[in-house]
């Protein structure tokens, strides 16, 4: 039987000093011996997805205490990728994932906590906490802040639901007036919560649900809705139940590595592919798998992408569909139900709320149950009022969206496509693979051939697009933006948004060893591995080289003879210290912290985790 970790610091004569300090935090004599459960909060006033989290840790804590535990809350950092984007701030985004994972590990192990509740929400925070939970392997439950409501606007005589990306595209389009742009900007992000489309934050929160590490509704219930309070309260109660099952009954099935097993990772990736989630999820799931010592690689993702259909499309893949619509259709449990109906989910996987995923689906899939409370839960609707306050409204739809033919979630027979929403491409340009979000690619450009336009920074590519030097048929290639080369693997939302605003979204492609925001759509191929800075072939592409992309056959090639590529490689190596670096020095301040990250990071094909 495992011993409570906390007793290292709460029991024994030699821990008198530690107990004195525990008492100074408010612990009483009767508290020593109770499980100490850490609450990792990520509240910050910098990020709309986290601005409402300040008091939610104590909401969880109250339930932990009422259930017989001791709750101790701490905070970690959170970066807003949207605010950090378009300047050197984005260099810090991906590296912050490792800082978050480390900070959670440090706090848990330094204070010998018995269990963990992770209050996350946005892009790197959920992945960082997920990595930490798999390192630590103590009972853990995730509960996120939830998605924001979509913006509602009557714009140019059209009634639209909009988000951050719509504001960016509107601003870049020269035919829109200043007032029209300002109107869109004011409407795009009306409430607290993670951006309303299937961007990275919402994708990852949906995937913790698919992994079995969070409660039903975690990925889709709006941040503003009163029902989300139930998730926080239940997380507090349920973590104590998991603690007792592990420490008092020796039940290892409640541990993160038992729940997030290989079959759970396959379930999560299957969900991701079926809903056209952010390509960043590939990066983060690969990283989490490494932390949990799960054999889950790009090979498995490639295999799954060939057999999983697209059952759900959400902004930015389609207009006017947001997370609130997914929730009305049954959320992630509804999507899991449709995938299970055609044998694509392993329902023997464990969860934090039911013994198996099969049991969970019987209760929470709206197509399988007539339980009134479940149906009421998924009828939670947006309030339509601008607010930064959690649980501030309780509006409900009159009915659920149970249409599996033309509704938000479809069955396999009526899928958007029988091929998955994410694809792994291989070829002489990406020996170790690269990723494309096929759910966001127009059918007319699933195969594409064009000349490479070479840029060695995101900034130079943006300038070229805005100055109209990119033409229909071009392939914008941005290199030296990978984990090591950036460093930090910047997101390329601005180049893709500007291509879209220039009317080039369906007639151009973009290839990079950097990554893309979950808000990206179009023929945008990222995570090219190996990256330019580690000797990848992307560094050898020259202006005008023809590149051929074939998504149906999962290939990406530059049409250059092998002998010529070898000649270019020898020529590059002859540069010595200047090899595998941008031709011209970039105006970019790389701090010691970023240099340390670059020195230890691995390629995107390995999740950009550190190699130590």
Curated annotation (Swiss-Prot):
Binds 1 [2Fe-2S] cluster per subunit. This cluster acts as a Lewis acid cofactor. [2Fe-2S] cluster binds at residues 122, 195. It catalyses: (2R)-2,3-dihydroxy-3-methylbutanoate = 3-methyl-2-oxobutanoate + H2O; (2R,3R)-2,3-dihydroxy-3-methylpentanoate = (S)-3-methyl-2-oxopentanoate + H2O. GO terms for molecular function: 2 iron, 2 sulfur cluster binding; dihydroxy-acid dehydratase activity; magnesium ion binding. Keywords: 2Fe-2S, Amino-acid biosynthesis, Branched-chain amino acid biosynthesis, Iron, Iron-sulfur, Lyase, Magnesium, Metal-binding. The modification N6-carboxylysine is found at residue 124. One of its GO terms (cellular component) is cytosol. Pfam families: ILV_EDD_C (PF24877), ILVD_EDD_N (PF00920). The active site is at residue 517. Its cofactor is [2Fe-2S] cluster; Mg(2+). It is an enzyme of class 4 (lyase). One of its GO terms (biological process) is L-valine biosynthetic process. Gene3D superfamilies: IlvD/EDD C-terminal domain-like. Functions in the biosynthesis of branched-chain amino acids. Catalyzes the dehydration of (2R,3R)-2,3-dihydroxy-3-methylpentanoate (2,3-dihydroxy-3-methylvalerate) into 2-oxo-3-methylpentanoate (2-oxo-3-methylvalerate) and of (2R)-2,3-dihydroxy-3-methylbutanoate (2,3-dihydroxyisovalerate) into 2-oxo-3-methylbutanoate (2-oxoisovalerate), the penultimate precursor to L-isoleucine and L-valine, respectively. Homodimer. Belongs to the IlvD/Edd family. This is Dihydroxy-acid dehydratase. It comes from Bartonella henselae (strain ATCC 49882 / DSM 28221 / CCUG 30454 / Houston 1) (Rochalimaea henselae). The lineage of its organism: Bacteria, Pseudomonadati, Pseudomonadota, Alphaproteobacteria, Hyphomicrobiales. The gene is ilvD.
């Amino acid at each position: 039987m495992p011993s409570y970790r906390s007793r290292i610091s709460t029991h024994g004569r030699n821990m008198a000093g530690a107990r004195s300090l525990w008492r100074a935090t408010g612990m009483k004599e009767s508290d020593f011996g109770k499980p100490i459960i850490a609450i990792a909060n990520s509240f910050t006033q910098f990020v709309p997805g986290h601005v409402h989290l300040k008091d939610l840790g104590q909401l969880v804590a109250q339930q932990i205490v009422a259930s017989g535990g001791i709750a101790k809350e701490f905070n970690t950092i959170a970066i807003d990728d949207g605010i950090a984007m378009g300047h050197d701030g984005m260099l810090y985004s991906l590296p912050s994932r490792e800082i978050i994972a480390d900070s959670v590990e440090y706090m848990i192990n330094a204070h010998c906590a018995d269990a963990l509740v992770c209050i996350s929400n946005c892009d790197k925070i959920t992945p960082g906490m997920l990595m930490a939970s798999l390192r630590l392997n103590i009972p853990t439950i995730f509960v996120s802040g939830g998605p924001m409501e979509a913006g509602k606007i009557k714009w140019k005589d059209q009634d639209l639901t909009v988000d951050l990306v719509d504001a960016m595209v509107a601003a870049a389009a020269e035919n829109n007036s200043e007032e029209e742009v300002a109107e869109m900007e004011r409407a795009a992000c009306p409430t607290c919560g993670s951006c309303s489309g299937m961007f990275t934050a919402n994708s990852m929160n949906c995937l913790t649900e698919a992994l079995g590490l969070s409660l039903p509704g975690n990925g889709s219930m709006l941040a503003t809705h009163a029902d989300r309070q139930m998730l926080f309260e239940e997380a507090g109660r349920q973590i104590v139940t998991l603690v007792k099952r592990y420490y008092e009954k020796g039940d290892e099935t409640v541990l993160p590595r038992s729940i997030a097993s290989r079959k759970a990772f396959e379930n999560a990736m299957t969900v991701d592919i079926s809903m056209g989630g952010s390509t960043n999820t590939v990066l983060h799931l690969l990283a989490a798998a490494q932390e949990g010592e799960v054999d889950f690689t790009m090979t498995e993702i490639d295999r799954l992408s060939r057999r999983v259909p697209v059952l759900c499309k959400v902004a930015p893949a389609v207009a006017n569909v947001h997370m609130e619509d997914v929730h009305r259709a049954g959320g992630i449990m509804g999507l899991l139900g449709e995938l299970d109906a055609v044998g694509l989910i392993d329902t023997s996987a464990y969860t934090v709320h039911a013994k198996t995923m099969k049991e969970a689906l019987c209760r929470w899939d709206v197509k399988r149950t007539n339980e009134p409370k479940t149906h009421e839960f998924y009828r939670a609707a947006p309030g339509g009022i601008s607010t930064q306050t959690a649980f501030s409204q309780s509006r409900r739809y009159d009915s659920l969206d149970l249409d599996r033919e033309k509704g938000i979630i479809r069955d396999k027979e009526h899928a958007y496509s029988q091929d998955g929403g994410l694809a792994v491409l291989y070829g002489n340009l990406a020996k170790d693979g690269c990723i494309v979000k096929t759910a966001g690619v127009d059918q007319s450009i699933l195969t594409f051939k064009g000349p490479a336009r070479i840029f060695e920074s995101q900034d130079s590519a943006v300038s070229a697009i805005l100055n109209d030097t990119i033409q229909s048929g071009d392939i914008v290639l941005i290199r030296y933006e990978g984990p090591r080369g950036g460093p930090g693997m910047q997101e390329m939302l601005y180049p893709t948004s500007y291509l879209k605003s220039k009317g080039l979204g369906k007639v151009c492609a973009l290839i990079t060893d950097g990554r893309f925001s979950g808000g990206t759509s179009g023929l945008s191929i990222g995570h090219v591995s190996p990256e330019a800075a580690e000797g990848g072939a992307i560094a050898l592409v020259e202006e005008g080289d023809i590149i051929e992309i074939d998504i149906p056959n999962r290939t990406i090639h530059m049409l250059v003879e092998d002998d010529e590529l070898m000649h270019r490689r020898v020529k590059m190596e002859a540069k010595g210290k200047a090899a595998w670096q941008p031709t011209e020095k970039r105006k970019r301040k790389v701090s010691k912290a970023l240099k340390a990250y670059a020195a230890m990071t691995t390629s995107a094909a390995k999740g950009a985790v550190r190699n130590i």
